Protein backbone atom coordinates (compact mmCIF):
# COMPACT_ATOMS: atom_id res chain seq x y z
CA UNK A 1 0.00 0.00 0.00
CA UNK A 2 2.81 2.38 0.97
CA UNK A 3 4.55 1.62 -2.31
CA UNK A 4 1.43 2.51 -4.34
CA UNK A 5 1.00 5.79 -2.44
CA UNK A 6 4.65 6.64 -3.04
CA UNK A 7 4.36 5.67 -6.71
CA UNK A 8 1.25 7.79 -7.29
CA UNK A 9 2.84 10.74 -5.45
CA UNK A 10 5.94 10.47 -7.62
CA UNK A 11 3.91 10.20 -10.81
CA UNK A 12 1.82 13.22 -9.87
CA UNK A 13 4.91 15.30 -9.23
CA UNK A 14 6.44 14.09 -12.48
CA UNK A 15 3.36 14.99 -14.53
CA UNK A 16 3.16 18.45 -12.94
CA UNK A 17 6.83 19.00 -13.68
CA UNK A 18 6.34 17.96 -17.30
CA UNK A 19 3.31 20.20 -17.71
CA UNK A 20 5.08 23.34 -16.44
CA UNK A 21 8.27 22.60 -18.37
CA UNK A 22 7.28 22.35 -22.04
CA UNK A 23 10.76 23.00 -23.27
CA UNK A 24 12.10 20.18 -21.15
CA UNK A 25 9.42 17.82 -22.44
CA UNK A 26 10.17 18.87 -25.98
CA UNK A 27 13.81 18.07 -25.52
CA UNK A 28 12.82 14.61 -24.32
CA UNK A 29 10.70 14.19 -27.45
CA UNK A 30 13.62 15.24 -29.57
CA UNK A 31 15.71 12.70 -27.69
CA UNK A 32 13.36 9.91 -28.83
CA UNK A 33 13.49 11.10 -32.41
CA UNK A 34 17.29 11.33 -32.32
CA UNK A 35 17.82 7.85 -30.89
CA UNK A 36 19.55 5.27 -33.05
CA UNK A 37 16.87 2.60 -32.99
CA UNK A 38 18.14 0.40 -35.79
CA UNK A 39 19.07 -2.29 -33.27
CA UNK A 40 15.37 -2.80 -32.53
CA UNK A 41 14.88 -4.33 -35.96
CA UNK A 42 17.99 -6.52 -35.74
CA UNK A 43 16.38 -9.26 -33.65
CA UNK A 44 15.86 -12.27 -35.90
CA UNK A 45 12.44 -13.90 -36.06
CA UNK A 46 14.07 -17.19 -35.08
CA UNK A 47 14.84 -15.61 -31.70
CA UNK A 48 11.24 -14.59 -31.11
CA UNK A 49 9.16 -17.02 -29.06
CA UNK A 50 6.13 -18.14 -30.98
CA UNK A 51 7.20 -16.69 -34.33
CA UNK A 52 6.76 -20.08 -35.93
CA UNK A 53 3.49 -20.89 -34.21
CA UNK A 54 0.97 -18.67 -35.90
CA UNK A 55 -2.59 -19.83 -35.58
CA UNK A 56 -3.37 -22.41 -38.21
CA UNK A 57 -6.95 -21.22 -38.35
CA UNK A 58 -7.56 -19.09 -41.41
CA UNK A 59 -11.32 -19.04 -41.35
CA UNK A 60 -14.09 -18.39 -38.90
CA UNK A 61 -16.15 -21.37 -39.95
CA UNK A 62 -18.79 -21.10 -37.24
CA UNK A 63 -19.76 -17.60 -38.37
CA UNK A 64 -19.33 -16.99 -42.07
CA UNK A 65 -16.90 -14.14 -42.36
CA UNK A 66 -16.54 -13.48 -38.66
CA UNK A 67 -18.59 -10.33 -38.83
CA UNK A 68 -21.58 -11.62 -36.90
CA UNK A 69 -19.37 -12.02 -33.96
CA UNK A 70 -18.95 -8.48 -32.85
CA UNK A 71 -21.38 -7.31 -30.16
CA UNK A 72 -23.64 -5.82 -32.79
CA UNK A 73 -23.39 -8.90 -34.81
CA UNK A 74 -26.80 -8.76 -36.46
CA UNK A 75 -26.56 -5.36 -38.10
CA UNK A 76 -25.37 -4.12 -41.45
CA UNK A 77 -23.32 -0.97 -41.40
CA UNK A 78 -20.31 -0.60 -39.19
CA UNK A 79 -20.82 3.11 -38.72
CA UNK A 80 -24.58 3.11 -38.30
CA UNK A 81 -25.82 -0.14 -36.86
CA UNK A 82 -22.84 -2.32 -36.12
CA UNK A 83 -21.97 -4.93 -38.70
CA UNK A 84 -24.23 -7.62 -40.12
CA UNK A 85 -21.73 -8.22 -42.89
CA UNK A 86 -19.11 -10.68 -44.06
CA UNK A 87 -16.38 -8.09 -44.56
CA UNK A 88 -12.97 -9.18 -43.47
CA UNK A 89 -12.67 -12.95 -43.93
CA UNK A 90 -12.90 -14.02 -47.56
CA UNK A 91 -10.96 -17.17 -46.78
CA UNK A 92 -13.87 -18.81 -44.99
CA UNK A 93 -15.61 -21.57 -46.89
CA UNK A 94 -18.60 -20.26 -48.86
CA UNK A 95 -21.99 -21.80 -48.30
CA UNK A 96 -23.28 -24.15 -50.99
CA UNK A 97 -25.04 -22.07 -53.62
CA UNK A 98 -28.57 -23.31 -54.43
CA UNK A 99 -30.19 -22.85 -57.80
CA UNK A 100 -31.75 -19.37 -57.80
CA UNK A 101 -33.81 -17.78 -60.54
CA UNK A 102 -32.26 -14.31 -60.76
CA UNK A 103 -33.70 -13.41 -64.15
CA UNK A 104 -35.09 -10.12 -62.79
CA UNK A 105 -31.95 -9.07 -60.90
CA UNK A 106 -29.79 -6.69 -62.96
CA UNK A 107 -26.03 -7.25 -62.78
CA UNK A 108 -24.23 -3.93 -62.53
CA UNK A 109 -20.65 -3.27 -63.59
CA UNK A 110 -18.87 0.04 -63.62
CA UNK A 111 -19.57 0.37 -67.34
CA UNK A 112 -23.37 0.18 -66.98
CA UNK A 113 -23.83 1.64 -63.49
CA UNK A 114 -24.71 5.14 -64.68
CA UNK A 115 -27.16 3.86 -67.30
CA UNK A 116 -29.06 1.70 -64.80
CA UNK A 117 -29.31 4.46 -62.19
CA UNK A 118 -30.21 7.27 -64.60
CA UNK A 119 -32.70 5.31 -66.70
CA UNK A 120 -34.77 4.00 -63.78
CA UNK A 121 -36.55 6.07 -61.16
CA UNK A 122 -36.27 3.40 -58.46
CA UNK A 123 -33.25 1.09 -58.08
CA UNK A 124 -32.34 -1.07 -55.09
CA UNK A 125 -28.65 -1.99 -55.28
CA UNK A 126 -26.95 -4.78 -53.33
CA UNK A 127 -23.16 -4.70 -52.89
CA UNK A 128 -22.07 -8.27 -52.20
CA UNK A 129 -19.06 -10.59 -52.10
CA UNK A 130 -19.17 -14.13 -53.56
CA UNK A 131 -17.79 -15.62 -50.32
CA UNK A 132 -20.27 -13.78 -48.07
CA UNK A 133 -22.61 -16.19 -46.28
CA UNK A 134 -25.24 -13.53 -45.59
CA UNK A 135 -25.26 -12.53 -49.26
CA UNK A 136 -25.86 -16.14 -50.25
CA UNK A 137 -28.73 -16.41 -47.77
CA UNK A 138 -30.23 -13.19 -49.08
CA UNK A 139 -29.97 -14.13 -52.77
CA UNK A 140 -33.21 -16.17 -53.21
CA UNK A 141 -35.26 -13.64 -51.22
CA UNK A 142 -33.75 -10.77 -53.19
CA UNK A 143 -34.48 -12.50 -56.50
CA UNK A 144 -38.10 -13.18 -55.53
CA UNK A 145 -38.54 -9.55 -54.46
CA UNK A 146 -37.09 -8.42 -57.79
CA UNK A 147 -39.76 -10.36 -59.67
CA UNK A 148 -42.61 -8.97 -57.57
CA UNK A 149 -41.38 -5.37 -57.60
CA UNK A 150 -40.80 -5.42 -61.35
CA UNK A 151 -44.52 -4.74 -61.81
CA UNK A 152 -44.11 -1.51 -59.81
CA UNK A 153 -41.27 -0.24 -61.99
CA UNK A 154 -38.59 -0.97 -59.38
CA UNK A 155 -35.24 -2.44 -60.46
CA UNK A 156 -33.30 -4.69 -58.09
CA UNK A 157 -29.62 -4.91 -58.97
CA UNK A 158 -26.43 -6.37 -57.55
CA UNK A 159 -22.75 -5.41 -57.68
CA UNK A 160 -19.84 -7.75 -56.94
CA UNK A 161 -17.79 -5.44 -54.71
CA UNK A 162 -14.72 -7.67 -54.97
CA UNK A 163 -14.58 -6.88 -58.69
CA UNK A 164 -16.00 -3.35 -58.71
CA UNK A 165 -13.71 -1.89 -56.04
CA UNK A 166 -14.04 1.72 -57.16
CA UNK A 167 -17.84 1.64 -56.94
CA UNK A 168 -17.66 0.03 -53.51
CA UNK A 169 -15.25 2.72 -52.30
CA UNK A 170 -17.30 5.53 -53.84
CA UNK A 171 -20.38 4.40 -51.90
CA UNK A 172 -18.40 3.65 -48.72
CA UNK A 173 -19.25 -0.01 -48.55
CA UNK A 174 -17.97 -1.32 -45.21
CA UNK A 175 -19.72 -4.67 -44.99
CA UNK A 176 -21.62 -7.24 -46.98
CA UNK A 177 -24.35 -7.16 -47.96
CA UNK A 178 -24.78 -3.39 -48.20
CA UNK A 179 -28.04 -2.25 -49.84
CA UNK A 180 -28.73 1.25 -51.14
CA UNK A 181 -32.02 2.54 -52.52
CA UNK A 182 -31.78 5.04 -55.39
CA UNK A 183 -34.64 7.41 -56.20
CA UNK A 184 -34.01 9.65 -59.22
CA UNK A 185 -30.27 9.08 -58.79
CA UNK A 186 -30.17 9.97 -55.09
CA UNK A 187 -29.46 7.16 -52.65
CA UNK A 188 -30.11 6.33 -49.02
CA UNK A 189 -29.46 3.19 -46.94
CA UNK A 190 -31.88 0.28 -47.10
CA UNK A 191 -33.06 -0.43 -43.55
CA UNK A 192 -35.57 -3.21 -44.12
CA UNK A 193 -35.49 -6.94 -43.50
CA UNK A 194 -33.94 -9.89 -45.35
CA UNK A 195 -37.03 -11.68 -46.64
CA UNK A 196 -38.96 -11.18 -49.86
CA UNK A 197 -41.94 -9.86 -47.92
CA UNK A 198 -39.97 -7.31 -45.90
CA UNK A 199 -38.04 -6.10 -48.94
CA UNK A 200 -41.25 -5.64 -50.94
CA UNK A 201 -43.02 -3.91 -48.06
CA UNK A 202 -40.11 -1.54 -47.42
CA UNK A 203 -39.77 -0.55 -51.08
CA UNK A 204 -43.51 -0.08 -51.64
CA UNK A 205 -43.66 2.25 -48.66
CA UNK A 206 -40.92 4.35 -50.21
CA UNK A 207 -42.55 4.62 -53.62
CA UNK A 208 -46.26 4.69 -52.82
CA UNK A 209 -48.80 5.91 -50.30
CA UNK A 210 -48.41 4.90 -46.69
CA UNK A 211 -51.99 3.61 -46.49
CA UNK A 212 -53.90 1.67 -49.14
CA UNK A 213 -57.69 1.56 -49.49
CA UNK A 214 -59.53 -1.76 -49.16
CA UNK A 215 -62.98 -1.52 -50.69
CA UNK A 216 -63.82 -5.06 -51.90
CA UNK A 217 -63.90 -8.48 -50.27
CA UNK A 218 -61.69 -9.92 -53.01
CA UNK A 219 -58.97 -7.37 -52.28
CA UNK A 220 -59.31 -8.04 -48.56
CA UNK A 221 -58.89 -11.78 -49.13
CA UNK A 222 -55.68 -11.21 -51.11
CA UNK A 223 -54.24 -9.08 -48.32
CA UNK A 224 -55.12 -11.60 -45.62
CA UNK A 225 -53.56 -14.50 -47.52
CA UNK A 226 -50.37 -12.63 -48.43
CA UNK A 227 -48.62 -13.66 -45.22
CA UNK A 228 -47.51 -10.11 -44.53
CA UNK A 229 -48.06 -8.20 -41.31
CA UNK A 230 -51.11 -6.01 -41.84
CA UNK A 231 -52.75 -3.12 -40.02
CA UNK A 232 -56.34 -2.23 -40.94
CA UNK A 233 -58.00 0.98 -39.87
CA UNK A 234 -61.82 0.88 -39.84
CA UNK A 235 -62.62 4.55 -40.33
CA UNK A 236 -65.59 6.87 -40.71
CA UNK A 237 -64.08 8.30 -43.89
CA UNK A 238 -61.15 7.52 -46.19
CA UNK A 239 -60.04 11.15 -45.98
CA UNK A 240 -59.74 13.51 -43.07
CA UNK A 241 -58.18 13.53 -39.59
CA UNK A 242 -58.47 9.77 -38.98
CA UNK A 243 -56.75 9.00 -42.28
CA UNK A 244 -54.03 11.58 -41.56
CA UNK A 245 -53.19 10.00 -38.18
CA UNK A 246 -53.11 6.50 -39.68
CA UNK A 247 -50.97 7.66 -42.59
CA UNK A 248 -48.49 9.37 -40.23
CA UNK A 249 -48.19 6.18 -38.18
CA UNK A 250 -47.55 4.12 -41.31
CA UNK A 251 -44.41 6.12 -42.07
CA UNK A 252 -42.79 4.89 -38.86
CA UNK A 253 -43.17 1.19 -39.72
CA UNK A 254 -41.26 -0.09 -42.74
CA UNK A 255 -42.14 -3.76 -42.25
CA UNK A 256 -45.92 -3.51 -41.77
CA UNK A 257 -48.51 -2.83 -44.49
CA UNK A 258 -51.23 -0.31 -43.59
CA UNK A 259 -54.76 -0.38 -45.04
CA UNK A 260 -57.99 1.49 -44.38
CA UNK A 261 -61.65 0.75 -45.10
CA UNK A 262 -65.17 2.02 -44.47
CA UNK A 263 -66.75 -1.27 -45.60
CA UNK A 264 -68.29 -3.21 -42.64
CA UNK A 265 -67.90 -6.52 -44.49
CA UNK A 266 -64.18 -5.92 -44.99
CA UNK A 267 -63.85 -5.00 -41.32
CA UNK A 268 -65.55 -8.26 -40.36
CA UNK A 269 -63.04 -10.27 -42.41
CA UNK A 270 -60.31 -8.67 -40.28
CA UNK A 271 -61.99 -9.74 -37.03
CA UNK A 272 -63.42 -6.30 -36.31
CA UNK A 273 -67.00 -5.89 -35.12
CA UNK A 274 -68.79 -4.00 -37.95
CA UNK A 275 -70.95 -2.33 -35.31
CA UNK A 276 -68.00 -1.22 -33.19
CA UNK A 277 -67.28 2.44 -32.67
CA UNK A 278 -65.08 3.96 -35.35
CA UNK A 279 -62.22 4.55 -35.74
CA UNK A 280 -61.06 1.05 -34.83
CA UNK A 281 -57.83 -0.72 -35.70
CA UNK A 282 -56.50 -4.27 -35.81
CA UNK A 283 -53.07 -5.81 -36.46
CA UNK A 284 -52.98 -9.21 -38.18
CA UNK A 285 -49.88 -11.41 -38.38
CA UNK A 286 -49.22 -15.05 -39.15
CA UNK A 287 -47.68 -15.93 -35.77
CA UNK A 288 -49.53 -17.81 -33.01
CA UNK A 289 -51.03 -14.62 -31.59
CA UNK A 290 -52.59 -13.63 -34.91
CA UNK A 291 -54.97 -10.81 -33.93
CA UNK A 292 -54.22 -7.72 -31.83
CA UNK A 293 -56.94 -5.08 -31.30
CA UNK A 294 -56.11 -1.43 -30.61
CA UNK A 295 -58.07 0.24 -27.81
CA UNK A 296 -56.27 3.56 -27.35
CA UNK A 297 -56.67 7.10 -28.63
CA UNK A 298 -56.56 7.21 -32.44
CA UNK A 299 -53.47 9.43 -32.75
CA UNK A 300 -50.10 8.78 -34.39
CA UNK A 301 -48.05 8.28 -31.20
CA UNK A 302 -50.47 5.75 -29.72
CA UNK A 303 -50.82 3.90 -33.03
CA UNK A 304 -47.04 3.65 -33.48
CA UNK A 305 -46.57 2.35 -29.94
CA UNK A 306 -49.28 -0.25 -30.45
CA UNK A 307 -47.90 -1.54 -33.75
CA UNK A 308 -44.31 -1.61 -32.47
CA UNK A 309 -45.34 -3.61 -29.40
CA UNK A 310 -47.54 -6.12 -31.25
CA UNK A 311 -45.97 -6.69 -34.67
CA UNK A 312 -43.49 -9.28 -33.41
CA UNK A 313 -44.43 -12.76 -32.30
CA UNK A 314 -44.74 -13.31 -28.56
CA UNK A 315 -41.59 -15.39 -28.97
CA UNK A 316 -39.53 -14.90 -32.12
CA UNK A 317 -37.66 -17.94 -33.40
CA UNK A 318 -34.09 -16.98 -34.25
CA UNK A 319 -33.11 -17.58 -37.88
CA UNK A 320 -31.00 -15.68 -40.38
CA UNK A 321 -34.20 -14.16 -41.74
CA UNK A 322 -35.54 -13.00 -38.37
CA UNK A 323 -32.21 -11.75 -36.98
CA UNK A 324 -32.50 -8.23 -38.48
CA UNK A 325 -36.12 -7.92 -37.33
CA UNK A 326 -35.07 -8.85 -33.81
CA UNK A 327 -31.81 -6.99 -33.39
CA UNK A 328 -32.57 -3.91 -35.49
CA UNK A 329 -35.82 -3.28 -33.64
CA UNK A 330 -36.36 -0.05 -31.75
CA UNK A 331 -36.68 -2.32 -28.69
CA UNK A 332 -33.03 -2.82 -27.76
CA UNK A 333 -33.38 -5.35 -24.96
CA UNK A 334 -33.98 -9.03 -25.64
CA UNK A 335 -34.42 -12.18 -23.60
CA UNK A 336 -32.91 -15.15 -25.44
CA UNK A 337 -33.83 -18.71 -24.52
CA UNK A 338 -31.37 -21.36 -25.75
CA UNK A 339 -33.11 -24.72 -25.81
CA UNK A 340 -33.01 -28.10 -27.58
CA UNK A 341 -36.03 -29.60 -29.31
CA UNK A 342 -36.41 -32.22 -26.56
CA UNK A 343 -36.67 -29.50 -23.92
CA UNK A 344 -38.63 -26.94 -25.88
CA UNK A 345 -42.29 -27.90 -25.37
CA UNK A 346 -42.64 -27.24 -21.64
CA UNK A 347 -40.02 -24.50 -21.43
CA UNK A 348 -41.41 -22.50 -24.36
CA UNK A 349 -44.88 -22.52 -22.80
CA UNK A 350 -43.47 -20.85 -19.68
CA UNK A 351 -41.44 -18.46 -21.82
CA UNK A 352 -44.46 -17.43 -23.90
CA UNK A 353 -46.56 -16.85 -20.80
CA UNK A 354 -43.93 -14.48 -19.40
CA UNK A 355 -43.63 -12.69 -22.75
CA UNK A 356 -47.23 -11.46 -22.51
CA UNK A 357 -46.18 -9.10 -19.70
CA UNK A 358 -43.42 -7.40 -21.70
CA UNK A 359 -44.97 -6.43 -25.05
CA UNK A 360 -43.24 -3.35 -26.39
CA UNK A 361 -40.59 -3.54 -23.64
CA UNK A 362 -38.59 -6.70 -24.29
CA UNK A 363 -38.23 -8.98 -27.32
CA UNK A 364 -38.44 -12.68 -26.42
CA UNK A 365 -36.34 -14.94 -28.67
CA UNK A 366 -35.88 -18.72 -28.78
CA UNK A 367 -32.68 -20.21 -30.20
CA UNK A 368 -32.62 -23.86 -31.30
CA UNK A 369 -29.41 -25.39 -29.91
CA UNK A 370 -29.79 -28.38 -32.23
CA UNK A 371 -29.40 -26.19 -35.30
CA UNK A 372 -25.84 -26.45 -36.60
CA UNK A 373 -26.11 -23.47 -38.97
CA UNK A 374 -26.95 -20.74 -36.49
CA UNK A 375 -28.10 -22.15 -33.14
CA UNK A 376 -24.77 -23.47 -31.93
CA UNK A 377 -22.66 -20.60 -33.33
CA UNK A 378 -24.94 -18.02 -31.73
CA UNK A 379 -24.76 -19.91 -28.43
CA UNK A 380 -20.98 -19.85 -28.66
CA UNK A 381 -21.00 -16.11 -29.30
CA UNK A 382 -23.11 -15.47 -26.22
CA UNK A 383 -21.00 -17.80 -24.08
CA UNK A 384 -23.77 -20.38 -23.65
CA UNK A 385 -22.51 -23.90 -22.98
CA UNK A 386 -23.55 -27.11 -21.26
CA UNK A 387 -26.84 -28.97 -21.15
CA UNK A 388 -30.27 -27.71 -20.18
CA UNK A 389 -32.11 -24.58 -21.28
CA UNK A 390 -30.26 -21.30 -20.77
CA UNK A 391 -31.80 -17.83 -20.55
CA UNK A 392 -29.88 -14.59 -20.99
CA UNK A 393 -30.74 -10.92 -21.26
CA UNK A 394 -29.01 -9.00 -24.03
CA UNK A 395 -28.79 -5.25 -24.49
CA UNK A 396 -28.16 -4.68 -28.19
CA UNK A 397 -27.15 -1.03 -28.22
CA UNK A 398 -23.80 0.71 -28.73
CA UNK A 399 -22.57 -0.79 -25.45
CA UNK A 400 -23.90 -4.37 -25.61
CA UNK A 401 -24.10 -6.39 -22.41
CA UNK A 402 -25.21 -9.91 -21.48
CA UNK A 403 -26.94 -11.05 -18.29
CA UNK A 404 -27.33 -14.71 -17.30
CA UNK A 405 -30.47 -16.04 -15.62
CA UNK A 406 -29.75 -18.43 -12.76
CA UNK A 407 -32.87 -20.35 -11.89
CA UNK A 408 -35.61 -22.65 -13.11
CA UNK A 409 -37.38 -21.66 -16.32
CA UNK A 410 -40.78 -20.73 -14.89
CA UNK A 411 -42.95 -17.84 -16.04
CA UNK A 412 -43.03 -16.07 -12.66
CA UNK A 413 -39.25 -16.27 -12.27
CA UNK A 414 -38.72 -15.10 -15.84
CA UNK A 415 -40.95 -12.10 -15.10
CA UNK A 416 -38.82 -11.15 -12.09
CA UNK A 417 -35.66 -11.50 -14.18
CA UNK A 418 -37.23 -9.42 -16.96
CA UNK A 419 -38.21 -6.62 -14.57
CA UNK A 420 -34.72 -6.54 -13.04
CA UNK A 421 -33.27 -6.51 -16.56
CA UNK A 422 -35.45 -3.57 -17.58
CA UNK A 423 -34.52 -1.65 -14.43
CA UNK A 424 -30.76 -2.27 -14.82
CA UNK A 425 -30.50 -4.24 -11.58
CA UNK A 426 -28.47 -7.14 -13.02
CA UNK A 427 -24.72 -7.69 -13.14
CA UNK A 428 -23.41 -8.15 -16.71
CA UNK A 429 -21.62 -11.32 -17.78
CA UNK A 430 -18.34 -11.31 -19.71
CA UNK A 431 -16.80 -14.30 -21.47
CA UNK A 432 -13.44 -15.64 -20.36
CA UNK A 433 -11.05 -18.45 -21.22
CA UNK A 434 -9.50 -20.24 -18.23
CA UNK A 435 -6.67 -18.30 -16.59
CA UNK A 436 -3.42 -19.85 -17.92
CA UNK A 437 -1.48 -21.91 -15.36
CA UNK A 438 1.81 -20.53 -16.71
CA UNK A 439 2.08 -16.99 -18.04
CA UNK A 440 5.81 -16.28 -18.17
CA UNK A 441 6.33 -15.58 -21.87
CA UNK A 442 7.38 -12.13 -23.09
CA UNK A 443 3.81 -11.52 -24.28
CA UNK A 444 1.49 -12.10 -21.36
CA UNK A 445 -1.83 -13.85 -21.97
CA UNK A 446 -4.88 -11.89 -20.84
CA UNK A 447 -8.33 -13.45 -20.43
CA UNK A 448 -11.53 -11.97 -19.11
CA UNK A 449 -10.96 -13.26 -15.58
CA UNK A 450 -7.40 -11.91 -15.16
CA UNK A 451 -7.90 -8.66 -17.10
CA UNK A 452 -8.18 -6.49 -13.99
CA UNK A 453 -5.14 -8.09 -12.38
CA UNK A 454 -2.84 -7.62 -15.39
CA UNK A 455 -4.14 -4.80 -17.57
CA UNK A 456 -5.65 -2.60 -14.87
CA UNK A 457 -2.63 -2.87 -12.57
CA UNK A 458 -2.12 0.82 -11.76
CA UNK A 459 1.63 0.39 -11.28
CA UNK A 460 2.22 -0.81 -14.85
CA UNK A 461 2.03 0.67 -18.35
CA UNK A 462 0.25 -2.04 -20.36
CA UNK A 463 0.03 -2.61 -24.13
CA UNK A 464 -2.81 -4.95 -25.14
CA UNK A 465 -3.51 -6.56 -28.52
CA UNK A 466 -7.09 -7.80 -28.96
CA UNK A 467 -6.90 -10.41 -31.72
CA UNK A 468 -8.84 -13.22 -33.38
CA UNK A 469 -7.28 -16.61 -34.19
CA UNK A 470 -8.66 -16.50 -37.76
CA UNK A 471 -7.54 -12.91 -38.43
CA UNK A 472 -4.86 -12.67 -41.13
CA UNK A 473 -3.73 -9.21 -40.02
CA UNK A 474 -3.24 -10.52 -36.48
CA UNK A 475 -1.14 -13.40 -37.76
CA UNK A 476 0.99 -10.99 -39.79
CA UNK A 477 1.48 -8.77 -36.73
CA UNK A 478 2.53 -11.56 -34.36
CA UNK A 479 6.28 -11.82 -35.19
CA UNK A 480 6.74 -8.06 -34.82
CA UNK A 481 4.72 -7.99 -31.60
CA UNK A 482 6.77 -10.84 -30.11
CA UNK A 483 9.97 -9.08 -31.15
CA UNK A 484 8.85 -5.89 -29.43
CA UNK A 485 8.02 -7.81 -26.26
CA UNK A 486 11.42 -9.51 -26.22
CA UNK A 487 13.22 -6.18 -26.52
CA UNK A 488 11.18 -4.69 -23.69
CA UNK A 489 10.99 -7.68 -21.35
CA UNK A 490 13.55 -6.24 -18.90
CA UNK A 491 11.42 -3.13 -18.29
CA UNK A 492 9.52 -3.97 -15.12
CA UNK A 493 7.08 -1.08 -15.48
CA UNK A 494 5.91 -2.11 -18.97
CA UNK A 495 3.82 -5.18 -19.81
CA UNK A 496 3.11 -6.41 -23.36
CA UNK A 497 -0.08 -8.48 -23.53
CA UNK A 498 -2.62 -10.04 -25.89
CA UNK A 499 -6.20 -11.29 -25.56
CA UNK A 500 -8.32 -13.48 -27.84
CA UNK A 501 -11.26 -11.16 -28.51
CA UNK A 502 -13.49 -13.99 -29.75
CA UNK A 503 -13.53 -15.87 -26.44
CA UNK A 504 -12.86 -13.11 -23.90
CA UNK A 505 -14.61 -9.86 -23.06
CA UNK A 506 -14.07 -6.88 -20.81
CA UNK A 507 -15.79 -3.47 -20.79
CA UNK A 508 -12.39 -1.76 -21.09
CA UNK A 509 -11.39 -3.72 -24.20
CA UNK A 510 -13.91 -2.81 -26.88
CA UNK A 511 -12.75 -3.91 -30.31
CA UNK A 512 -14.38 -2.72 -33.54
CA UNK A 513 -12.08 -4.95 -35.56
CA UNK A 514 -9.06 -7.21 -35.30
CA UNK A 515 -6.42 -6.50 -34.36
CA UNK A 516 -7.28 -3.67 -31.98
CA UNK A 517 -4.27 -2.46 -29.99
CA UNK A 518 -4.88 -0.49 -26.81
CA UNK A 519 -2.53 1.22 -24.36
CA UNK A 520 -3.36 1.55 -20.66
CA UNK A 521 -1.06 4.11 -18.96
CA UNK A 522 0.01 3.51 -15.37
CA UNK A 523 -1.81 5.58 -12.79
CA UNK A 524 -4.70 6.28 -15.17
CA UNK A 525 -6.65 3.04 -15.50
CA UNK A 526 -10.04 4.64 -14.84
CA UNK A 527 -9.88 6.54 -18.15
CA UNK A 528 -10.52 5.03 -21.56
CA UNK A 529 -7.42 3.37 -23.06
CA UNK A 530 -5.45 4.96 -25.88
CA UNK A 531 -5.98 3.30 -29.27
CA UNK A 532 -2.62 2.64 -30.91
CA UNK A 533 -2.68 3.96 -34.46
CA UNK A 534 0.85 3.74 -35.81
CA UNK A 535 3.00 1.80 -38.26
CA UNK A 536 3.24 -1.91 -37.50
CA UNK A 537 7.00 -1.88 -36.83
CA UNK A 538 9.02 -2.40 -33.66
CA UNK A 539 10.49 1.10 -33.94
CA UNK A 540 7.07 2.76 -34.35
CA UNK A 541 5.65 0.89 -31.37
CA UNK A 542 8.72 1.68 -29.27
CA UNK A 543 8.37 5.38 -30.05
CA UNK A 544 4.67 5.25 -29.24
CA UNK A 545 5.36 3.65 -25.87
CA UNK A 546 8.14 6.14 -25.07
CA UNK A 547 5.75 9.01 -25.75
CA UNK A 548 2.80 7.61 -23.82
CA UNK A 549 4.26 5.60 -20.96
CA UNK A 550 3.61 7.18 -17.58
CA UNK A 551 6.77 5.61 -16.16
CA UNK A 552 9.68 6.77 -18.36
CA UNK A 553 12.12 4.27 -19.82
CA UNK A 554 14.79 4.04 -22.47
CA UNK A 555 16.68 1.17 -24.08
CA UNK A 556 20.43 1.49 -24.42
CA UNK A 557 21.89 0.40 -27.72
CA UNK A 558 23.77 -2.87 -27.19
CA UNK A 559 27.52 -2.87 -27.63
CA UNK A 560 27.00 -5.24 -30.55
CA UNK A 561 23.99 -5.06 -32.88
CA UNK A 562 24.09 -8.80 -33.43
CA UNK A 563 20.88 -10.58 -32.66
CA UNK A 564 20.68 -11.15 -28.91
CA UNK A 565 20.53 -14.85 -28.12
CA UNK A 566 20.41 -14.83 -24.35
CA UNK A 567 18.78 -12.88 -21.61
CA UNK A 568 22.19 -11.36 -20.78
CA UNK A 569 22.35 -9.70 -24.20
CA UNK A 570 18.91 -8.10 -23.91
CA UNK A 571 19.19 -4.29 -24.25
CA UNK A 572 19.59 -2.55 -20.91
CA UNK A 573 17.03 -0.17 -19.50
CA UNK A 574 17.90 3.42 -18.82
CA UNK A 575 15.34 5.38 -16.81
CA UNK A 576 14.90 8.95 -17.98
CA UNK A 577 14.04 11.87 -15.73
CA UNK A 578 10.92 13.07 -17.40
CA UNK A 579 7.92 12.06 -19.46
CA UNK A 580 6.59 13.73 -22.54
CA UNK A 581 3.12 15.19 -22.57
CA UNK A 582 0.57 13.00 -24.36
CA UNK A 583 -0.51 16.13 -26.20
CA UNK A 584 2.68 16.02 -28.21
CA UNK A 585 1.71 12.76 -29.84
CA UNK A 586 1.21 12.70 -33.59
CA UNK A 587 -0.39 9.85 -35.43
CA UNK A 588 1.47 7.94 -38.06
CA UNK A 589 0.46 8.75 -41.60
CA UNK A 590 0.04 5.09 -42.30
CA UNK A 591 -2.51 2.97 -40.41
CA UNK A 592 -2.54 -0.77 -40.60
CA UNK A 593 -5.67 -2.44 -41.82
CA UNK A 594 -7.71 -4.64 -39.52
CA UNK A 595 -10.17 -7.46 -39.92
CA UNK A 596 -13.71 -6.20 -39.35
CA UNK A 597 -15.74 -8.07 -36.74
UniProtKB/Swiss-Prot annotation:
Residues 37-101, 555-597 are annotated as: Disordered. Pfam families: Thioredoxin, Thioredoxin_6. The keyword Isomerase applies. It comes from the Eukaryota. The active site is at residues 132, 135, 471, 474. Residues 560-573 have a biased composition (Polar residues). Expressed in germinating seedling, including the cotyledons and hypocotyl, in vascular tissues, in pollen grains, root tips, leaf trichomes, developing seeds and siliques. Interacts with MEE8 and MED37A. Acts as a protein-folding catalyst that interacts with nascent polypeptides to catalyze the formation, isomerization, and reduction or oxidation of disulfide bonds. This is Protein disulfide isomerase-like 1-4. It comes from Arabidopsis thaliana (Mouse-ear cress). The gene is PDIL1-4.
Amino acid sequence: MAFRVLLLFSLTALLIFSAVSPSFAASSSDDVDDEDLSFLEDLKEDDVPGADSLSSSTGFDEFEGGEEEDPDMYNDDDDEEGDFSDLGNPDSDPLPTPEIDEKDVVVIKERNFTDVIENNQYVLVEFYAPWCGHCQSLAPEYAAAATELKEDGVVLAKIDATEENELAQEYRVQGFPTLLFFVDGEHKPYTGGRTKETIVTWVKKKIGPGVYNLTTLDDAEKVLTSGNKVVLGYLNSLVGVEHDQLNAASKAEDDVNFYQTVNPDVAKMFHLDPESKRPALVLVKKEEEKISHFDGEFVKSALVSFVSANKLALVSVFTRETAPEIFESAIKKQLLLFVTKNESEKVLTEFQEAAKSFKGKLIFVSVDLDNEDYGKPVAEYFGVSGNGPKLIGYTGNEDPKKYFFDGEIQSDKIKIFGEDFLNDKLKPFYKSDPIPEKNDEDVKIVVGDNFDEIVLDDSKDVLLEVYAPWCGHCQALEPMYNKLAKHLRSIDSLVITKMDGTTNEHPKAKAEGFPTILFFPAGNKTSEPITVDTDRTVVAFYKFLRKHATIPFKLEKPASTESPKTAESTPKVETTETKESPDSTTKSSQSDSKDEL
